[in-house]
Amino acid sequence: MAALFLRGFVQIGNCKTGISKSKEAFIEAVERKKKDRLVLYFKSGKYSTFRLSDNIQNVVLKSYRGNQNHLHLTLQNNNGLFIEGLSSTDAEQLKIFLDRVHQNEVQPPVRPGKGGSVFSSTTQKEINKTSFHKVDEKSSSKSFEIAKGSGTGVLQRMPLLTSKLTLTCGELSENQHKKRKRMLSSSSEMNEEFLKENNSVEYKKSKADCSRCVSYNREKQLKLKELEENKKLECESSCIMNATGNPYLDDIGLLQALTEKMVLVFLLQQGYSDGYTKWDKLKLFFELFPEKICHGLPNLGNTCYMNAVLQSLLSIPSFADDLLNQSFPWGKIPLNALTMCLARLLFFKDTYNIEIKEMLLLNLKKAISAAAEIFHGNAQNDAHEFLAHCLDQLKDNMEKLNTIWKPKSEFGEDNFPKQVFADDPDTSGFSCPVITNFELELLHSIACKACGQVILKTELNNYLSINLPQRIKAHPSSIQSTFDLFFGAEELEYKCAKCEHKTSVGVHSFSRLPRILIVHLKRYSLNEFCALKKNDQEVIISKYLKVSSHCNEGTRPPLPLSEDGEITDFQLLKVIRKMTSGNISVSWPATKESKDILAPHIGSDKESEQKKGQTVFKGASRRQQQKYLGKNSKPNELESVYSGDRAFIEKEPLAHLMTYLEDTSLCQFHKAGGKPASSPGTPLSKVDFQTVPENPKRKKYVKTSKFVAFDRIINPTKDLYEDKNIRIPERFQKVSEQTQQCDGMRICEQAPQQALPQSFPKPGTQGHTKNLLRPTKLNLQKSNRNSLLALGSNKNPRNKDILDKIKSKAKETKRNDDKGDHTYRLISVVSHLGKTLKSGHYICDAYDFEKQIWFTYDDMRVLGIQEAQMQEDRRCTGYIFFYMHNEIFEEMLKREENAQLNSKEVEETLQKE
């Protein structure tokens, strides 16, 4: 018994209602002895069944324009079917099938090269009608009249998804087979039990009529045996049918059971079994129904900020992979933990069932609200604030999980080195997806302009918050220019701990680059009433973000991706996503209102505090990590490395900073007589650095009230370190005697129009311009350029030495830039639509690595968009930007292409079977 499965556009004609509109449908032609039928599955969720045996009046096939075919089927009751849009092969196969049925010449049609057996299932609704209604029409027994009235069969009474029951397709089939055996052994006993449960009156009538059923037992047994074989075949081939009213997933119970089994095996065990050979076959079915895949997220009430952020996060393959690529048993994680909430949403975010999405989003919102009460109600909130809380809470979640299942070192010591390698089974740790993907490390150098004391502070951040230019410019700024301005040197009102001088110079640089660089534009400013207002100025969205100019020799590249052998099967996740597109009723436990979900498992938070600053390398070998740690760094240049606070101090950033000090210290002169404001007897060679003790205690640095807010320091660390062994390189000690201090430098507020200038403007009045240097990395303020140009004059002999030092420094910086080019590629944008800060709507534009196109996510609405159009439309509304390191981006594309090739090979293999 075979089935023909094809696709076309169908119109149904009726003498009473007329002809319906043309609708796309999947057509299933089922051939059985005297029970041939045609089943139409529509996109709307409905399906229609037409009996063909002894019911066909006429079949006409017409072809026109070469490849367009039109089939007209007329039934005995003058109803008709008009089918078009069929290929020539499909049209001929369907015509042969209908003619054979019309002529009562039953020969199973063969469709070469097609996987028809995969879709040879019939609906349980039809099985119920056949097995429990029509079989007993010949019998005078009224045993199944109740089943006929309710349309519910014995098979439907079997429990489906419960918290304690998880059955695979094979297990369900085995249970059904056992029930059939009991039914065949004693049909009357089965009828008695069934009727006792439903209606005692009918049970008495059935008991009186049992004697009349004996003669039909043999025939019934044969028919039931035939139905059982067909049922087993259907279960083995597709496992996708149910009678829940869902259009194509008719027998959703089997789908539910198999789906939950897969999810439980995937989530609740350390590894999943590879015994599920039917997953690829199930994948084929869902590819026939792409309309059942819904990528949008429902709005729970002013939760567009949450939907936009979640769409951006979950569209990043490396983050999704790291979220699921954990070695600890998922069954031990509380269901209301944020890690589990994100994992479940990652599985079911594409399901067609909106109620499931609402439930998952509500649980996730409760998990966030347990730590941040601002998100508890239905008020409008800021997307960046939600992103910050989400990443921080997820990181804290993983730190406490690492504390619970703390990896043991091979030496049995608690202070095992924090950099744990996944290829060491005894020292494997649980990588945090936030640390491996978003966490970046900045080195903030603050130098006193009076005594030259330098304070080095390491800052760990998950994103960079960047100010927009406050002055209106003729040409719009870009993400690149505002990003470069953030890393430019600037003057700070910072009180020196040594000499109590109030003016310092601060410079930022990268110590470690992230895989994903999140750039947050501060789209707010003060109005005339000193109140915050939204800043909707136009900003050009850069497709590529270059960060090499803000790196140095000690800058570490992003953490490497997991090796192919260690990556969790991301294709499996896609299959499960498609499988869950049906009406799956999964009951999740209520979220527990607690500010610390994992608190009962932890005795003290001291260990988690010690784990701050861990770098866990997941899935990379020792050789790769040594290459990672040693790349672009030399032992002689590395002064010290502190793993506890991630301080990575090199000569390069210090020299960079001191070069800037040498320039700016000579460019300002005293107002009276042009004499220096400070004594020239303070050499740079006496610069002191704060040292870091071996076991530093964390102390919070407190600024005095006289200082302005330093908004550049997003998350300053609690530690200030002293290291008396660190000194300025010798090449700068010669300049120390010529250094003059000043405190009259002005802070330039105006930002560059485009990327920061790479050279000084050509002076028109100075005679000696050949010695004027072009430093590419020293972002000097515009207000100081005129005084800097005075250094080109030979009237001051010390200027030549200073310029020579600056020139040598610029050449060295240029050579360092040539060693490696770090570029980031735009992959997602979160935008705020609205005129005020307290109202509006959030949307998300994200790059789909599987389809390699951009999509706009507006809650439940998902639309494709061109990247250039997106960049143009989001100039005034772009708020949060996600950039992926270009090497990681290319690697992701290669992996996706390989996965698609493997998937295509699997499909071709399955179709040949």
UniProtKB/Swiss-Prot annotation:
Native organism taxonomy: Eukaryota, Metazoa, Chordata, Craniata, Vertebrata
Record organism: Homo sapiens
Family according to the record: Belongs to the peptidase C19 family.
Keywords, sorted A to Z: Cell projection, Cilium, Cytoplasm, Cytoskeleton, Flagellum, Hydrolase, Nucleus, Protease, Thiol protease, Ubl conjugation pathway
Function: Deubiquitinase regulating several biological processes through the deubiquitination of components of these processes. Involved in somatic cell reprogramming through the 'Lys-48'-linked deubiquitination and stabilization of CBX4 and CBX6, two components of the polycomb-repressive complex 1 (PRC1). Also deubiquitinates and probably stabilizes the androgen receptor (AR), regulating the androgen receptor signaling pathway. May play a role in spermatogenesis.
Biological process per Gene Ontology, one example term: negative regulation of proteasomal ubiquitin-dependent protein catabolic process
Catalysed reactions, semicolon-separated: Thiol-dependent hydrolysis of ester, thioester, amide, peptide and isopeptide bonds formed by the C-terminal Gly of ubiquitin (a 76-residue protein attached to proteins as an intracellular targeting signal)
Leading EC class: hydrolase
Protein name per Swiss-Prot or TrEMBL: Ubiquitin carboxyl-terminal hydrolase 26
Positions of region (Disordered): 601-636, 753-772
